[in-house]
Amino acid sequence: MLIFEHSRKNRLNYSQAPATRPAKNNIPDNLKRKSAPLLPEVSEMDTVRHYTRLSQKNFSIDTEFYPLGSCTMKYNPRACNALAMLPQFLSRHPLAPEDTGQGFLACMYELQEILKDVTGMSAVSLTSMAGAQGELIGITMIRAYHEARGDTERTEIIIPDAAHGTNPATAVMCGYKVIEIPTDRDGDVDMEALKAAVSPRTAGLMLTNPSTLGVFEKKVAEMSRVVHEAGGLLYYDGANLNAVLGKVKPGDMGFDVIHMNLHKTFSTPHGGGGPGAAPVGVADCLLPYLPIPIVAHEQGVYRWLTEKDRPQSIGRLSAHMGNAGVLLRAYIYVRLLGAEGMFRIAEYATLNANYLLAELRKLGFEIAYPSRRASHEFIVTMKEIKDKTGVTAMHLAKRLLDKGFHAPTVYFPLLVPECLLIEPAETESKETLDRFVVAMKEILDEIDTQPEMVKTAPHNMPLRKIDDVKAARELDLVWNPAG
């Protein structure tokens, strides 16, 4: 039920004093509304009940384990929210004089420096407002680099078949042809295929490490050498940075540019359509092209670097700095952790993943790439179970909802049939992981004894089955008061 359907004429929320006439007179006539907005008329109590009921219908990291692979659904510390919402931050206008915002600029500068240090990059820009935009920035800078050298024949970007879908989309948006290379049977990029793919047309390689298969690319140094010798650059998709934070730096692996998903590794909130943030770091070769503004610290004063300071920059990617509130939350998070805490992130994330992998293997679940240690996530394949019983990965995922857990990522990566991509972030306790194992055992037993119970799940959700085809073909995105 929509909030508008609760609306009753003249049923108002709390009132406030109307604007005085002088205040109204300050608004130009062409900016004044000609008619009242179509807002619902609902009491405060009904409003609270409506949104509370909606929240109870949704899964959330605040209520239960959320093992969504390749998403790093870690807990968002409330201290980060509380400090980022201090009036001194919220009341700061982005266009206010720099000397009135030195505290905020100091936070942004220190965040740039911390991200430089943990990634091994030479400089960082915070302006990107999403992971996909961070990718676009990175490949745009690679293009600018080659064009500045007069190397216009480089028209191809190499991408492994296990990559996130945004990688090829980004390359195409930047005008490149995508060259896909396969994964070998151990889960690594096929080196012979990479060597065959590089050429004078190679602009770069986009790589996630650890990959979406949940394994660390063992030959990343050799991959870097092959691409660089061909004149290309390496792009690091930072989606899985959480697995190696503080243990190995992308810069040391040979990458020239990286984006970092703050909503994953640095614990800013997920979802809701935003706001997001994905700072971009670069090696020396791409320094001139970083998007602006960037915070500089000169003679004890913080200031923005703009087009005048960086004439080769690819320009601005957001209205101003980007999503300041998200960046503040990430800064507070890393300061709360400190250097030692940041080292433990990868340790605990990897420990949780390998513990869960071992427990599910004991139950009889088939693990993809069984000879490899999980980096931070791992893949269960249900192909054999499906062949024997007809129960699919999607069926199991739906049944997990009845057990009180959000489902893992299903059917990604596409390389593994009937797969569940499971990622327990470092913030989950052993007790939580054990409860998840119990739920998985219960479902495995149900597959043997009452498979229809699993096939027809979920049974306890407010909405049981969704018509995916109807939802895609008959979009209903805007409320209309006329019905």
From Swiss-Prot:
- What does the record list as GO biological process? glycine decarboxylation via glycine cleavage system
Q: Which GO terms describe its molecular function?
A: glycine binding; glycine dehydrogenase (decarboxylating) activity; pyridoxal phosphate binding
Instruction: Using the record, list the residue span of the signal peptide; answer none if the entry has no such feature.
Output: none
Q: What is its EC number?
A: 1.4.4.2
- Give the UniProt keywords, A-Z: Oxidoreductase, Pyridoxal phosphate
Q: Name one Pfam family in it.
A: Aminotran_5
CC annotations in GO: cytosol; glycine cleavage complex
What SUPFAM superfamilies does the record point to?
Answer: PLP-dependent transferases (SSF53383)
The record's top EC class is oxidoreductase
> Where N6-(pyridoxal phosphate)lysine occurs, residue numbers?
K264
HAMAP family reported in the protein's UniProt record: GcvPB (MF_00713)
What's the subunit arrangement here?
Answer: The glycine cleavage system is composed of four proteins: P, T, L and H. In this organism, the P 'protein' is a heterodimer of two subunits.
Belongs to which family? Belongs to the GcvP family. C-terminal subunit subfamily.
Record's function text: The glycine cleavage system catalyzes the degradation of glycine. The P protein binds the alpha-amino group of glycine through its pyridoxal phosphate cofactor; CO(2) is released and the remaining methylamine moiety is then transferred to the lipoamide cofactor of the H protein.
Q: What is this protein called?
A: Probable glycine dehydrogenase (decarboxylating) subunit 2
What is the scientific name of the source organism?
Nitrosomonas eutropha (strain DSM 101675 / C91 / Nm57)
The primary gene name is gcvPB
